[in-house]
Curated annotation (Swiss-Prot):
It comes from Mus musculus. This is Heme oxygenase 1. The keyword Transmembrane applies. CDD domains: HemeO (cd19165). A soluble form arises by proteolytic removal of the membrane anchor. It is found in: Endoplasmic reticulum membrane.
Amino acid sequence: MERPQPDSMPQDLSEALKEATKEVHIQAENAEFMKNFQKGQVSREGFKLVMASLYHIYTALEEEIERNKQNPVYAPLYFPEELHRRAALEQDMAFWYGPHWQEIIPCTPATQHYVKRLHEVGRTHPELLVAHAYTRYLGDLSGGQVLKKIAQKAMALPSSGEGLAFFTFPNIDSPTKFKQLYRARMNTLEMTPEVKHRVTEEAKTAFLLNIELFEELQVMLTEEHKDQSPSQMASLRQRPASLVQDTAPAETPRGKPQISTSSSQTPLLQWVLTLSFLLATVAVGIYAM
């Protein structure tokens, strides 16, 4: 890897990360899915799949944050009460999948790839953990409330916020002020130009992992509508042993209310619209950072 020169990127880490991900911001601003997202058309089935993936991702991320909470390379960014999402996602899993959600939620290959990278970073390259925290938390914080309202309306969800706890940060009064604090803390992290370069590259990797996940889910849901075979569903339910209990997959709980969709929308179109929403959870939020 080519060593960056000291003056080849902004001095502040927050500015360096923003600069490094500028191309993704431009893509997000001009992408066609942004237009679809604004229509608020979201597939319930696809939304459930992504929420399950987010549960696995945040479980891994926050396990590694806890591992490194006293490590100087991350400690200034340790805000568990304000930012951590695992507990909120557990509430959402119970809403979407029922009381036995731990036994049945899917963990796709792309999700496993994402989880593996998070554990690898936390255990062997903790100085890169900031890139994943920055990409996820500030993005979610920036776009969370807007996305929550769109999802509530599109899927006729309760106004109380059930099923969407992930998008709510009850311990942050002002997202704008908190993001300013977070960036200031980021800029106190001591790192060489080479390490800073590696952190910015890892932020790009985080974006690629998200894109890989959404592309995979697009293929999976499209194929599932064509041929919903038992073997396919069994493969979908394979989960990392470190994340859930070692139990046999259970059948999906019955009795969950189903939200009807327009008969004029094909399954493929419904999924494209869902993908628009899912990508927006990264793109809209990150663009607002």
